[in-house]
Design a protein with these regions (language model features):
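Conserved alpha/beta-hydrolase "acid-adjacent" motif
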Residues: 252-258
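C-terminal catalytic histidine-bearing segment of alpha/beta-hydrolase fold enzymes
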Residues: 260-316
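N-terminal cap/lid segment of alpha/beta-hydrolase-fold proteins
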Residues: 21-85, 116
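Cap/lid segment of the alpha/beta-hydrolase catalytic domain
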Residues: 97-106, 123-149, 191-195, 199, ...
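Short beta-strand/loop motif that positions the catalytic acidic residue
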Residues: 239, 245-247
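Short beta-strand element of the alpha/beta-hydrolase
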Residues: 86-95
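Primarily recognizes the serine-hydrolase "nucleophile elbow" in alpha/beta-hydrolase
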Residues: 149-238
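Short amphipathic alpha-helix adjacent to the substrate-entry channel of hydrolases
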Residues: 104-122
Length: 316
């Protein structure tokens, strides 16, 4: 069993000690917005009520991670930009092996960074766990049917963000996605399956497009088959949005071949793509500072957003 799988098991095992059996809530001043007006489509049973777990024994960047699981009512939380508004927005998709959501490490931490750069952040709390409930290290490539509920949540959120563009002071042509690990896989899925409607329209928001204007999958999983080919459930084409990839070569959960195979497919399709590989960094580092050079990836991402015209060049 790989370390990330072990970590998930430890979170589950320690839940009786560290869990707060309450639904995760954002900090004061922010409100979760249900993304479905009623019950979500393809609703699956989960092992118990939604919970958030804090494990002080497992620190990442000197801080514990908050894990959310058993999500049946997906929500989005909007974080307005600080200072000058660039008009850009990013839907942030935390990872967690489709079993939990690393809601702070790969969620609120990211929103703090994005909003400090004048970018609206929309944090998606999508449905987990997927069936089967037990994460298995040999379950790659991730079957599209297993992530349909999560991908439905991503499609719906993209459309809702554009539907609220005027209200939230967002340019509807500058709406992107950023995700980590399993969330990185969802970034690749929404980047290549946006023309595939996965649920019946529920309101006028669903008349809009779910295609991201840019995509940032970080240490993504489930993209490479065992023989080194691209997961066929991620049909890259010339319509796939510009993409920014980051991964560590010593990623012990989702090997670097995940990014390499996706980069190759994007390049062959003439999709603008930028990839940064680092010798060290492991997996699930988020934005928390470390001594490794990979900790500087946010500055590279910000520069990339400028080069593709999503935000102004720094200092202008």
């Amino acid at each position: 069993m790989k370390p990330w799988a072990i970590a998930l098991c430890l979170l589950a095992a320690g839940s009786s000690v560290h869990a707060k059996t309450t639904v995760w809530q954002p900090v004061a001043g922010h409100t979760q917005i249900p993304i479905w007006p009623g019950a979500a489509p393809n609703l699956q049973p989960v092992p118990g009520p939604e919970t958030q777990t804090h494990n002080p024994d497992k620190l990442i960047g000197g801080l514990p991670m908050t894990a959310v699981t058993n999500v049946t009512q997906p929500t989005m939380t909007v974080y307005a930009p600080q200072g000058k508004n660039t008009g850009a927005a990013v839907v942030v998709i935390p990872g967690g092996g489709f079993q939990i959501l690393a809601i702070d490490l790969e969620g609120t931490d990211v929103c703090d960074w994005l909003t400090s750069r004048g970018i609206t952040c929309v944090l998606l709390k999508y449905r987990v766990p997927s069936v089967p409930y037990v994460w298995q290290s040999d379950s790659r490539p991730h079957n599209l049917s297993l992530s349909v509920p999560s991908l439905q949540d991503v499609q719906r959120t993209m459309r809702l963000v554009r539907a609220h563009a005027t209200q939230w002071h967002i340019d509807p042509h500058k709406v992107g996605v950023l995700g980590f690990s399993a969330g990185g896989f969802l970034v690749a899925e929404i980047s290549t399956n946006f023309e595939r409607r996965l649920y019946p329209p529920v309101d006028d928001a669903d008349k809009g497009s779910s295609r991201p204007d840019f995509a940032m999958p970080l240490y993504p999983g489930h993209l490479a088959t065992e023989d080194g080919k691209l997961n066929p459930n991620v049909p890259v084409s010339g319509k796939t949005p510009p993409t920014f990839l980051v991964q560590a070569e010593d990623d012990y959960v989702d090997g670097v071949e995940q990014s390499l195979v996706y980069y190759t497919a994007l390049a062959k399709a003439h999709v603008p793509v930028e990839m940064h590989l680092y010798a060290h960094g492991g997996h699930a580092f988020g934005l928390r500072p470390t001594s490794d050079p990979i900790t500087h990836w946010p500055a590279l991402a910000e520069a990339w957003l400028s080069t593709i015209g999503m935000i102004p060049v720094a200092g202008r």
